[in-house]
Amino acid sequence: MAKNQNQGQIAEHSARRYLEQRGLTFVEQNVRYRFGEIDIVMKDGSDWVFVEVKYRSPSQYGGAVNALSQAQTLRIRKAASHYIQINRIDAICRFDVVAVDPDAMQWIRDAF
């Protein structure tokens, strides 16, 4: 397994635990479609939460919170839309980002 892929999996696991400790309920992880991927699907009460986890090492410019491009958000929205449709979800949904840096974790609700 590549080092970056392993770090990404560790970051996703840490983000999941972090959100569960804050009251969210885990539903599914690494949901992949040909046009996009959802890192983590969770529920916050009756609301559905699609979580993008971003990891950056300290040497990478801008940190994890700045690592999400407009093209990436579009792919995530597309994947979430498909997920909502195939699972017949009729509830409030939001997109959160958990930015994981080696020294800190930042949870951004309604990030995009």
From Swiss-Prot:
Any GO molecular function: nucleic acid binding
Pfam family, one: UPF0102
InterPro entries found in the cross-reference section: Restrct_endonuc-II-like, tRNA_endonuc-like_dom_sf, UPF0102_YraN-like
Taxonomic superkingdom: Bacteria
Gene3D superfamilies cross-referenced by the UniProt entry: 3.40.1350.10
Disulfide linkage: none
Family membership noted in the UniProt record: Belongs to the UPF0102 family.
NCBIfam families: PRK12497.1-3, YraN family protein
HAMAP family noted in UniProt: UPF0102 (MF_00048)
Record protein name field: UPF0102 protein Spea_0251
Organism: Shewanella pealeana (strain ATCC 700345 / ANG-SQ1)
